[in-house]
Amino acid sequence: MRPLLTTFPSLIVLALVLAARPTVAAAQEFGFDPPPSATDPALPAALRDLAERIVPIYTDDDSTRYLANLAALQMTAGDPAAAHESRIALDKRLQSKEGRSPAGRAIVYAIYVQARMTEAEEHVSFASAFRQAFRATFEHLDDLAADDLEAWILAPSEPLREAVQHELDLQHDKHEIALEPALDLVRAWASFEAYSSIESLVRPLLTAEKERRYIVDEEVAIPVADGATIAATIVRPRAATENGKVATVLEFTLDRSSRDAREAAAHGYASVLALARIAGELAARPRAPFESDGDDARAVIDWIAQQPWSDGRVGMQGTGYGGFVAWSAAKRLPPALKAIATSDPMAPGIDIPMRGRIVLSSAYRWIYEMLPPPGDATPNDAAHWRKFDEEWYRSGRSYREFPTLPGPASVVFRRWLNYPSYDRFWQKWLPFGAEFAKVDIPVLTVTGYYSAGQTAALYYFTEHHKYDPNANHALLIGPFDEQTVEKGAPPSARGWIPDEVARIDPNAARYEWFAHALGGDESSELIRDNVNYELTGANEWRHAASLGALEQKRTRFYLQASPGGTANALAAKKRKSPSSLTATLNLRDRKDAAWRPSRELVLDVLPARDGTMLFMTEPFSAPVDVAGRLSGVLDFTINKQDVDLVLMLYELRSSGEYVKLFDPAYAFRASYAKDRVHRHLLVAGVRQQLPFQSEKMVGHQLQAGSRLVLALGINKRADSQVNYGSGKDVSEESIADAHAPVRIRWHDGSFIEIPSP
């Protein structure tokens, strides 16, 4: 798998071996008075003296750890030849013991050690020696291995310097150092010395390496409709295309600088990275996002299929907007399109500008940043736009009067507000209904439990399988958010420590899938069924034939008031005697203008919100698996004709911590819960039942002793529409339509169902 360089630079620049602790002579103390700064010219000599004293006495019962530490000590002591021999012995041991080749950072260090040895033995400059070692290593690597190693070799040295400084700070005002901290310092120094020495040398060598391996066309103008062109970068693997034709991986993006067109080429494909017209030349831009992309993609696919280097097969990939373009192209069924793989694909009308039919003000910011007026000087920071939201919210004006700025973005946003239902305006850009059954190609969708993009990702997946139960469409979902859905879960994020098995590289998994879909390789162990999910807390990837199969077994919990002021209950049985709970919310109140939900995934306390009620189970006596979508029936009486509801699930651990099972919360407009195409208003003052199914998937193992907690409330936030419940178009409502506070009486027929395979 590819190293997670862009996600975890600090991991790459840590010591050569993690947790490399000696088991012998740990009590040894060494006199040591280092300079206080990692960049002090006197530090190398001080560390060399320290290393020279440790090498003769250092032993460790763990031979792998011993060899790794010994190599760092030998390099620091100025003996690269001995360090080279230690690295060779370590590599042989890893291959014989674990059956694996050295990791990327170990190869980088081996190149550095070889260069220092050549410098000493042949009396040449380090730059010359490094070039020799670099070329000798890279000439034996295939394109993919070379691409992987490039990510490691470009790691910055500054975090390494910080690691050295941290170790020095621990020795402040001390005159002796124990063996363990001495090894920590030596390893940190060895890494810093290596990377800082090669930092200025690697880029010219990598450029030459790319020229040797790839044919690159930086600015290709591909003709599309209306006399316009799509700007594309095309990278082809030189060896493969000189020997024959290859399949192509096409990706549309809003910013070519944010993507590496060489990535697909390293996997053996012709790589075409195309700039969506909405982000291209002003004269050729369509009037709004989404409008031309499907037809443009079809034209680009047809063009690719006619090129002499193309074997006629095109796979599409993309994240966010690029994922939308792939699906918009699939709607048009171009013959050469053979597979699509997307991560958090956008779906206009589903997750932008609204989710759960509730329009989000962030959609306006997104349009504005894409279509800024000439000479725009609007601050591009969260605080500015947050103030924008709060000023509108406090004003009580209708959403139609949201304070947009001059320019085309305002026109687009207001036009979108005219279509609150998922009607033909939105349907025209994507497969709809039975059109999904015509998408008869392999599809992969990647998303995360903590990603806002999960809403659209699950929409594509469920609709495709709904209209074609035999669709070749796989879902890969784990504890990822918007930032990590491509790069994988880090060791910790937002207060949460993901399971070890979740720390995969979804990007590498996507190319493994392409090798299966386009190349006929065996399917990967990770993506071996239609639903592939990491059960957080269980440290295990699981697989199911469908969401329906996964959700076949459900556990029902009734929402019940608890006597005596204790927490409301999620009860396994419905009470015989009728009961109810009443929630109220003053829609005129604006004291909450600054409130936003915490992005932390583990909370010490849940936020107290007017109109929100908490329900919890008894502690579970054994671990409980929860995997699938939350569903249920809300049995209630309300004094309004509509309401926006919000639901959230937590695990309340015996430690008192609340762990989110998904994020963001599931918010939805009640009048669209049954049908996103047609609005069905509520009946004020009448008891009614509202079935619902969350657009969020859960994959979590509740610990023994934990409780399941449901937060059920009324959605009212400064950064989205406010539904005042009058029954009018919500964008037309203002605070004048609020009238009496919302009053919902939750009857004891309300229940949720938890899928528990």
What is the predicted role of each segment?
Residues 238-306, 488-497, 653-655, 664-667, ...:
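Cap/lid segment of the alpha/beta-hydrolase catalytic domain
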Residues 30, 292, 317, 321-389, ...:
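A catalytic-pocket lid/entrance helix-loop region that shapes and gates access to the active site
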Residues 7-21:
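Bacterial N-terminal signal peptides
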Residues 201-244, 616, 620-622, 680:
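N-terminal cap/lid segment of alpha/beta-hydrolase-fold proteins
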Residues 139-196, 200, 204-209, 266, ...:
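Accessory cap/linker subdomain of secreted extracellular hydrolases
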Residues 455-473:
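Active-site-adjacent alpha-helix of alpha/beta-hydrolase-fold enzymes
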Residues 439, 445-447:
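Short beta-strand/loop motif that positions the catalytic acidic residue
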Residues 396-397, 485, 492-757:
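C-terminal, loop-rich substrate-recognition/catalytic regions characterized by aromatic stacking residues
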